[in-house]
A protein has these predicted regions:
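Conserved N-terminal phosphate-binding loop of PLP-dependent enzymes in the Aspartate aminotransferase
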Residues: 1-404
Length: 404
């Protein structure tokens, strides 16, 4: 939809949002009217260099032509059916995903938090059915993030702050341990623990990758204790970190993995994949979703996955991510640069505000996000080139120098 076709001004649109919408976001002060590849464009055609990709969603670029074509073709055939009949996009995507990431079964959702809810439910049901009614406890990481619905929010290790504030008691059955501390995770487990749930990179927590020793140690410990390893790949999945799934960087395999964001090419879809044994915890009536596995979203995801794999965008994420982070370490006031592929966090010293850097980059027509007091996060489309990273670096450098 174009602004010129509405008879309204840009300010009219902003006013309507403020009047009618429940706002929980700090918006960029522009109207994103069109997008293509590495850029968003406002109603005047002004380009904005996109280094947030809808928060790690548009991995194969905004409005990828093959994804757009797949959506248009599917809309011409059938849009929504619920999950009573078989649909072709569901079946083809299920096979593609399971074979690509080495898992046995898939269950479709609509978002990342829904995928994590399903993962929690499956793990608890598996534990109770196999070991008895008390085997439901799950250990997650402090400062992690798993979503904003109640189960996922309760799994989020931010007690007393962050997304848990103001909602009363959290769902019972979770404990938190420090990230990358294998001993602390082992100590947090009890005879009632059925699973450890972990992000391979803590995105909202400041972009902190897990160490190989930690991830491999969790896998070995879960195997030893008859527990499940649940890996949240909502943000890290689908080539973002230099591998198709981040857990592949560690040479391990989860019992259940969640995904969303980068799977759908801009369309809302989430999923969990599980081993054959664990997947049997779900049967008719165990879980469900009206829109999960939506034919249009599955068609988009099938095209997106094809693009990611055919163009080796995992390889590009690793190559360009290494190139870009080496440059970012030369920025003034940098305390640390952390990354895995093209999931990048830059932490500045106490004199530089991450929010101020975000705003300064926006003023220079570049889009990034800020997390914490002094950290910026960048998750560009995986099609990004070294030349576009050079441009981004110059914008960030100019911004930081202006704030010094």
């Amino acid at each position: 939809m174009k602004l010129k076709d509405t008879g309204l001004t840009a300010q009219d649109i902003k006013d309507k949002v403020k009047k009618y919408m429940i706002e929980t976001y700090e918006r960029f002060d522009f109207i994103a009217e069109t997008a293509e590849g590495m850029y968003l464009y406002d109603e005047n055609g002004t380009p904005y260099l996109d280094f947030y990709a809808g928060i790690a969603v548009n991995n194969a670029g905004s409005r990828n032509p093959k994804v757009v074509a797949a959506v248009k073709d599917q809309v011409d055939d059938i849009m929504h059916t619920f999950n009573y009949p078989y649909t072709i996009p569901q079946a083809l995507l299920a096979e593609k995903v399971c074979k690509t990431i080495g898992m046995d079964k898939i269950f479709y959702q609509n978002s990342g938090t829904e995928a994590n809810e399903a993962m929690i439910k499956m793990a608890r049901k598996y534990g109770i059915e196999k070991y008895g009614p008390n085997r439901y406890h799950i250990v997650t990481a402090k400062d992690g993030f798993h979503g904003r619905t109640f189960g996922a929010m309760s799994a989020t290790g931010q007690p007393g702050n962050g997304c848990q504030v103001g909602f009363g008691p959290m769902t019972y059955g979770f404990s938190y341990a420090p990230y990358n501390d294998l001993k602390a995770f082992k100590d947090a487990c009890t005879e009632n623990t059925i699973a450890i749930m972990i992000e391979p990179v803590q995105g909202e927590g400041g972009v902190h990758p897990a160490t190989p020793e930690f991830m491999k140690g969790l896998r070995e410990f879960c195997d030893e204790k008859g527990m499940l390893l649940l890996i949240d790949e909502v943000q890290t999945g689908w080539c973002r970190t230099g591998a198709v799934m981040s857990y592949m960087n560690y040479g391990i395999k989860p019992d259940i993995v969640s995904m969303a964001k980068g799977l759908g090419g801009g369309m809302p879809i989430g999923a969990i994949c599980a081993t054959e044994e664990v997947s049997k915890a779900f049967s008719a009536g165990s879980h469900g979703t009206t829109f999960g596995g939506h034919p249009v979203c599955c068609a988009a995801a099938l095209a997106e996955v094809g693009e990611l794999l055919d163009r080796d965008l995992a390889g590009n994420a690793k190559k360009v991510g290494d190139y870009f982070t080496a440059k970012l370490e030369k920025l003034p006031h940098v305390k640390e640069v952390r990354h895995q592929g093209l999931l990048i966090g830059v932490e500045f010293d106490d004199t530089i505000s991450g929010v101020d850097v975000k705003h300064g980059c926006f003023d220079r027509h570049m889009l990034i996000t800020a997390i914490g007091s002094h950290i910026i996060r960048m998750v560009p489309p995986l099609i990004v080139s070294e030349e576009e990273c050079d441009k981004a670096f110059d914008i960030i450098k100019e911004t930081v120098e202006s704030l010094s």
